[in-house]
């Protein structure tokens, strides 16, 4: 039997304005130094309460949906909810594109559960990294420097007035992309993510061009001609263009035109009556 309350949550995509890898750890994970930025492309989760369990309906075929893992991690770290959920997931964010769609969905569910069960956000952030390395960022959202495996978040004042064009392609998996890196490529960025943030904040085009960096761009472009062509195509009408994450999406930034814009949030929550 369904309950009467529910929510509609927008879970926003992200791009990496800056992405470097600083080292490979003994446990096999890589540590990053990045500048994350949410954009106005979003998935929508329509959540209603049911008696028990988790039911997910979606408009795309997703194997091993991260929402199941999110529910399990939440239940094992906190008291299992005395209610179940039915989630209708409307996917608009391309998958396996470096846009963080799955992590954003996970953060949206964590946000809902923490709100319903009155769990402080700082406790939710601590378990978020167990679900995925980008999930902690989406619980904070907006503009942030991200370090470590993704669990160290430094929020920054929002960057507004920028527009984004995206092109997706057939890419390679994140694991394969990291396997293309070696330690000689680490820490080779021309400046820091903080310097790039200041350039965006002050609309300094020359510095934006100088400081924009993605460690994966050269190695992925060598492997994937389509991605290399997409980067070149977007550069014609953009301040800068590069990969987000390890791809396959490529973005271009401009002041006046684009399909999406920067937004100061990771998720947007609205309670509804069903």
Curated annotation (Swiss-Prot):
The protein's name in its UniProt record: 4-diphosphocytidyl-2-C-methyl-D-erythritol kinase
Family membership noted in the UniProt record: Belongs to the GHMP kinase family. IspE subfamily.
Major enzyme class: transferase
Pfam name, any one: GHMP_kinases_C
UniProt organism field: Thermosipho melanesiensis (strain DSM 12029 / CIP 104789 / BI429)
Binding locations of ATP: 94-104
Keyword ATP-binding: yes
Keywords attached to this entry: ATP-binding, Isoprene biosynthesis, Kinase, Nucleotide-binding, Transferase
Pathway participation: Isoprenoid biosynthesis; isopentenyl diphosphate biosynthesis via DXP pathway; isopentenyl diphosphate from 1-deoxy-D-xylulose 5-phosphate: step 3/6
Catalytic residues in the record: 14, 134
Purpose: Catalyzes the phosphorylation of the position 2 hydroxy group of 4-diphosphocytidyl-2C-methyl-D-erythritol.
GO MF annotation list: 4-(cytidine 5'-diphospho)-2-C-methyl-D-erythritol kinase activity; ATP binding
Catalytic activity: 4-CDP-2-C-methyl-D-erythritol + ATP = 4-CDP-2-C-methyl-D-erythritol 2-phosphate + ADP + H(+)
EC id: 2.7.1.148
GO terms, biological process: isopentenyl diphosphate biosynthetic process, methylerythritol 4-phosphate pathway; terpenoid biosynthetic process
Entry keyword annotation includes Transit peptide: no
InterPro entries linked: GHMP_kinase_C_dom, GHMP_kinase_C_sf, GHMP_kinase_N_dom, IspE, Ribosomal_Su5_D2-typ_SF, Ribsml_uS5_D2-typ_fold_subgr
């Amino acid at each position: 039997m369904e309950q009467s309350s529910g929510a509609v949550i927008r879970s926003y995509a992200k791009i990496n304005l800056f992405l470097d890898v600083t080292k490979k750890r003994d446990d096999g994970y890589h540590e990053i130094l990045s500048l994350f930025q949410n954009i106005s492309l979003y998935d929508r989760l329509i959540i209603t309460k049911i008696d028990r369990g988790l039911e997910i309906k979606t408009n795309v075929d997703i194997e091993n949906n991260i929402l199941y893992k999110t529910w399990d991690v939440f239940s094992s770290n906190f008291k299992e909810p005395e209610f179940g959920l039915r989630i209708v997931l409307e996917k608009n964010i391309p998958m396996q594109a470096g846009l963080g769609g799955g992590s954003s969905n996970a953060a949206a569910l964590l946000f809902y559960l923490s709100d319903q069960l009155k769990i402080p956000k700082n406790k939710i952030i601590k378990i978020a990294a167990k679900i995925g390395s980008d999930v902690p960022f989406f619980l904070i959202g907006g503009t942030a420097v991200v370090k470590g495996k993704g669990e160290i978040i430094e929020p920054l004042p929002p960057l507004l007035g920028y527009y984004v064009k995206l092109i997706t392609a057939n890419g390679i998996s994140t694991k394969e992309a990291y396997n293309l890196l070696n330690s000689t490529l680490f820490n080779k960025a021309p400046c820091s993510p903080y310097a790039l943030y200041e350039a965006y904040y002050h609309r300094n085009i020359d510095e934006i061009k100088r400081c924009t960096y993605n460690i994966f761009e050269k190695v992925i472009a060598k492997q994937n001609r389509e991605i290399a062509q997409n980067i070149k195509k977007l550069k014609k009408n953009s301040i800068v263009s590069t990969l987000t994450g390890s791809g396959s999406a490529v973005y271009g930034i401009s002041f006046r035109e684009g399909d999406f814009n920067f937004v100061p949030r990771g998720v947007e929550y609205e309670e509804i009556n069903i």
